[in-house]
């Protein structure tokens, strides 16, 4: 599943020698399968290992991965490079981001980006956006809810973040329109 070069194994062994006895390595996948997916390494104290973790054994240490992340780490490579900044670990995980098939209908592709890229950012303010439809004249029709409904920044968010992102990824779209009947309430972010 994960290949760790000899150089990287030696470096990780050196780092682990400075940690509490029994500490291993954990590979984490954040937002797996989405365009904002990230992969990282962390120390893994032995008391944080669960039955749902997959254990990968190497010569001097073990790597733990949660079961849900395994398919995203297939063919992953961890290497070590030395440059002017010092030693750096590099993680290459070719299956970290699911490819959106170009044959998938535009509505589904746009919705996937809204769910995986846009809504996680809006959730920081208690809001979200729902894709209602894409019109025949190629406008994405959306509706805000939660903290976004009634927020004084909603026009800015729509034009400068949502529309820019969607037009960048889907040039066939002509724009994004808001269908929301905005009512400022105690739950509105601003």
UniProtKB/Swiss-Prot annotation:
Keywords linked to the UniProt accession: 4Fe-4S, Iron, Iron-sulfur, Metal-binding
As one GO molecular function, the record gives: iron ion binding
Residues reported to bind [4Fe-4S] cluster? 148, 151
* Co-factor binding details: Binds 1 [4Fe-4S] cluster per subunit. The cluster is presumably bound at the interface of two monomers.
- Pfam families (alphabetical): Fe-S_biosyn, NifU
Task: Give the cofactors, semicolon-separated.
Answer: [4Fe-4S] cluster
Q: What are its GO biological-process terms?
A: iron-sulfur cluster assembly; protein maturation
Subunit (UniProt)? Homodimer.
Chain's role: Involved in iron-sulfur cluster biogenesis. Binds a 4Fe-4S cluster, can transfer this cluster to apoproteins, and thereby intervenes in the maturation of Fe/S proteins. Could also act as a scaffold/chaperone for damaged Fe/S proteins.
Q: Which family does it belong to?
A: Belongs to the NfuA family.
Q: What is this protein called?
A: Fe/S biogenesis protein NfuA
Organism (species) = Baumannia cicadellinicola subsp. Homalodisca coagulata
Its lineage opens with:
Bacteria, Pseudomonadati, Pseudomonadota, Gammaproteobacteria, Candidatus Palibaumannia
């Amino acid at each position: 599943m994960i290949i760790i070069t000899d150089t990287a194994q030696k470096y990780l062994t050196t780092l682990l020698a400075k940690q509490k006895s029994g500490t291993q390595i954990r590979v984490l996948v954040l937002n797996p399968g989405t365009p904002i997916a990230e992969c990282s390494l962390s120390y893994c104290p032995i008391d944080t290992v669960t039955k749902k973790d997959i254990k990968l054994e190497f010569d001097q240490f073990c790597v733990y991965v949660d079961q849900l992340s395994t398919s995203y780490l297939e063919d992953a490579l961890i290497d070590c490079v030395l440059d002017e900044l010092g030693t750096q670990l590099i993680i290459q995980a070719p299956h970290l981001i699911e490819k959106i098939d170009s044959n998938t209908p535009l509505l589904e592709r746009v919705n996937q980006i809204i769910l995986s890229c846009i809504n996680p950012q809006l959730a920081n303010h208690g809001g979200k956006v729902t894709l209602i439809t894409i019109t025949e004249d190629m406008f994405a029709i959306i509706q805000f809810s939660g903290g976004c409904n009634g927020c004084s920044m909603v026009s800015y968010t729509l034009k400068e973040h949502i529309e820019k992102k969607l037009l960048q990824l889907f040039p066939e779209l002509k724009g994004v329109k808001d269908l929301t009947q905005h009512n400022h309430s105690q739950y509105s972010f601003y």
